[in-house]
Amino acid sequence: MCIRDRNLGGMGDSEWRKEYSTETWGTEIESVCKKEKLKKPIVVGHSLGGMCGVYAASIMKKNLYGLIIVDTAIMPPSDNPPKFDFKIRANKIYKNLKEIKSRFRLVPGQVNALEYIMDYIAEKSIKKNKSGWSWKFDPNYMKIFNNDSFMERQAIYRDKLKGLKCRVAILRGEKSVIFPGSSAKYMHELMDKKSPIINVPEAHHHIMVDQPMALISALRSLIIDWDHSKPAKSS
């Protein structure tokens, strides 16, 4: 098994863009698969990354072997959408490493986050400059999180999820506040009940932070199964 772990544009060690969208990030995923000449590629995307994965799968069609969506909700049209109130600010400069790491937070917050994983992610999310320490991400990517764009993305991705040509599986944190059971049921029906919805016990939205071993076990099981089974045929 060959793993490629990449940062979407504007995040981590990737360069910043003038504008951001799930479509742009999805195209980045396709480009990596092509450049690396990956055989039978499987994309795993968490939260926003799941949306980007759906877009990548929609343009890659059968060139993508599989897509595993991790705690990404596509809501029924009748559900009330979440309210967004993000304020775009320039990344603050912190005096030292200890101070900036103490400011690292999950959104949404959750209990039982494993400290060693939080510490690892925090260290990978910061950079040193002449004045001190700051976050790596481009704060402007947060502009896509507003009520209008959220509803627009939901409508687009309902159609895209229905039309995917690759194998799809969905992992959901059993205690996730982002991905309620109603959305899981709705997504299952969108895919004609041919793709599994797997609830990870005791997991919240950031599954890799509170239930990492359960997440790894679920991913390995899916990938091994896909390598030895045939996909359900669409009616």
Placement of each model-derived feature along the sequence:
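Flexible "cap/lid" loop of the alpha/beta hydrolase fold
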Residues: 54-58, 65-99
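Catalytic histidine-centered segment of alpha/beta-hydrolase-like enzymes
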Residues: 203-212, 216
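Conserved small/polar residues in nucleotide/adenosyl-binding loops
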Residues: 1-5
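Conserved alpha/beta-hydrolase catalytic His-Asp/Glu region
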Residues: 91-152
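Alpha/beta-hydrolase active-site loop signature
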Residues: 7-12, 74, 204-207
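Gly/Ala-rich beta-loop-alpha elbow adjacent to hydrolase catalytic centers
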Residues: 45, 49, 53
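Active-site loop/oxyanion-hole signature of alpha/beta-hydrolase fold enzymes
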Residues: 8-45, 217
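Conserved serine/cysteine hydrolase catalytic core
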Residues: 128-190, 196
